[in-house]
Amino acid sequence: MLGAMFRADTLMPANLNPQGDGHYFIDRDGKAFRHILNFLRLGRLDLPRGYGETALLKAEADFYQIRPLLDALRELEASRGTPASTAALLHADVDVSPRQVHFSARRGPHHYELSSVQVDTFRANLFCTDPECLAAMRNRFGVAIGDRAEGGPHFRLEWASRPQELPEVEYQRLGLQPLWTGGPEDRREVANTPTFLEEVLRVALEHGFRLDSVFPDPEDLLNSRSLRFVRH
């Protein structure tokens, strides 16, 4: 069919060509048609790396009845095998437990004073079916306390920022640890839920996820307790 269109002795019937110039107008997909012409010129299939429109090109080859191109496309699909699915689920839960910590504060050489301060302990559980995204989460946060096992879909964190009033020695005695995010040059402490969820959101979007649900208040994203992301 394609050859007939280009032969000089093949004219379009006058009743199908109101302008009377006797030429065909090929109204097909331009991007796919470029690869068809390349195949006819080179005699081989030469597609760019990662070309993802083989189904469209196959339909065009079938329309033009180019059997060798159809065979080449079938061989290409067979060599690629079944494409890996990109669908994935990411779920982030975070909970805070405030507690009152009592300690003795030194006010002088022989003067101690009983004091207390509230310490917020955060616990987060990240569940992700995409290992690359989960690894990026680990890299973004590091691990304060929790599961260091590789390969599972869960990543758990537990941390607590040290209030200014709480002495460092008391903070360490309680076995508490902070959580940091970012690289060496832009490292910052994750001191609250909004900061944690903001980082989760950044990593999720970088890996192609979209926000699916927010709990408990969909209107208050960064102060939520649970975020669910999906990728199709």
Curated annotation (Swiss-Prot):
Residues 1-49 form the BTB domain. Pathway: Protein modification; protein ubiquitination. GO terms for biological process: negative regulation of neuroblast proliferation; negative regulation of smoothened signaling pathway; nervous system development; neuroblast differentiation; neuroblast proliferation; neuron differentiation; positive regulation of neuron differentiation; protein homooligomerization. One of its GO terms (molecular function) is identical protein binding. One of its GO terms (cellular component) is cytoplasm. Transmembrane segments: none annotated. InterPro entries: KCTD11/21_C, SKP1/BTB/POZ_sf, T1-type_BTB. It comes from the Eukaryota. Keywords: Cell cycle, Developmental protein, Growth regulation, Transferase, Tumor suppressor, Ubl conjugation pathway. Weakly expressed in lung. In the cerebellum, higher expression in non proliferating external granule cells layer than in highly proliferating ones. Overexpression of Kctd11 by lentiviral vector injection inhibits xenograft tumor growth in athymic nude mice. Homopentamer. Interacts with KCTD6 and KCTD21; KCTD11 and KCTD6 or KCTD21 may associate in pentameric assemblies. Component of the BCR(KCTD11) E3 ubiquitin ligase complex, at least composed of CUL3 and KCTD11 and RBX1. Interacts (via BTB domain) with CUL3; initially a 4:4 stoichiometry has been reported, however, electron microscopy revealed pentameric states of the BTB domain. Plays a role as a marker and a regulator of neuronal differentiation; Up-regulated by a variety of neurogenic signals, such as retinoic acid, epidermal growth factor/EGF and NGFB/nerve growth factor. Induces apoptosis, growth arrest and the expression of cyclin-dependent kinase inhibitor CDKN1B. Plays a role as a tumor repressor and inhibits cell growth and tumorigenicity of medulloblastoma (MDB). Acts as a probable substrate-specific adapter for a BCR (BTB-CUL3-RBX1) E3 ubiquitin-protein ligase complex towards HDAC1. The BTB domain is required for growth-suppressing properties. This is BTB/POZ domain-containing protein KCTD11. It comes from Mus musculus (Mouse).
